[in-house]
Structures are given as C-alpha cells and as structure tokens.
A protein has these predicted regions:
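Ordered hydrophobic segments in well-structured contexts
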Residues: 13-14, 32, 63-65
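Short, flexible, solvent-exposed loop/turn segments with mixed acidic/basic and small polar residues
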Residues: 14-25, 49-57
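Short Gly/charged-rich anion-binding patches and loops
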Residues: 39-40, 70
C-alpha cells in the first residue's frame, strides 16, 4: 500500500525521501508522517512534542515533516529507522 493510500485510510504512515532546503543546512532527508484522521495525527505528534500547528495540510494528505535529530529520534522509537538508513547508505552516490 502506498503512503497516500495509508494516509487516506486514516493510518499513521511514514514516507522518507531526499530533501534539501537552505533553511536547514545538513539535512538531506525528510520524513512525512501523515494521517487523514487529524485527531489521531495530533495525538500521535503530541507524544513527540510536535505541535498541531506544525501539520502541513498541503494537498489532501495532512502530515508532519520530520528532519534532523528529531527525525532520527522519532524514527528510532517508531521502529522505522531502516527507512532513514537506506538514504544514508546511498548518500555517497548523491554527490
């Protein structure tokens, strides 16, 4: 099932991809954590100190954007660190 399908079904879904933004030097990836059930997404984010106003409502897939140390900590606690490590292994090919 794709990330968009999982989000649409009201599941907490993770999607990590390459991302570079000059505002966040040193960050090469972002993890989108989405869920169409906004209350569920807010409750999920609260346990990690994420504020409801940080939810990105762009397109039809509400989500938090995780990056940097916060991304690594949350991905570790959620048992999803493999998504992040995949990109770290490939970073030498991105030069």
């Amino acid at each position: 099932m794709s990330w968009k399908e999982a989000v649409s079904r009201g599941e907490i879904a993770f999607l990590t991809h390459y991302w570079v933004d000059q505002r966040f030097p040193g960050c090469k990836t972002v993890t989108k954590v989405g869920c169409s059930d906004i209350e569920r997404l807010i409750m999920w984010g609260t346990q990690y100190g994420l504020k409801p106003e940080w939810i990105d409502y762009k397109e039809a897939y509400p989500h938090f954007d995780l990056f940097g140390q916060h991304q690594r900590m949350i991905m570790t606690k959620e048992g999803k660190l493999d998504q992040l490590k995949r990109f770290e292994k490939n970073k030498s090919t991105m030069s």
